[in-house]
């Protein structure tokens, strides 16, 4: 099928439908896909959400790898394996994991962008847009929001296709949206 360009970024707010849209887009690109999940189950609510996502993916026969911290290394390790598309869900959760560990984030961003650039398979990356809300009331939250925006800009600059999802509806910000089926 091969409908997608090399790098597609799907961006949207919380519960905007971005993950469902990204999954459908990926499945339309071919049947042999890898799902890189980045959400770490740090509390009961998150564990429940992850369980729901895992059950949904199992029905669609996704191959899944978890990459809570080592996303660039995980992508690098996929160079010898052949998939139609690699879906990363989600960049903001990966950033959360790194932020909480106080890693050198600018260096981590550079490393990830380099891995994305070098990837030979089609990539679909899901991320959150945090800049539409109110300005956070504390320094740590403002710093996180700013870092998320910086990372999104770096990935969007590399992307061939950038799609914003609002209320389950896609809007193309960069590139051309391929015609896809909603049968998945």
Residue map of PLM features:
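Residue-level signal for inorganic ion chemistry
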Residues: 22, 53, 87, 128, ...
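Short, glycine/serine-rich, charged loops/turns that create anion-binding
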Residues: 15, 40, 92, 130-131
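Residues at the starts of beta-strands that form the adenosine-phosphate
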Residues: 31-34, 84, 122, 161
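Helix-adjacent hinge/juxtasegments
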Residues: 60-108
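Pre-Walker A adenine-sensing motif
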Residues: 1
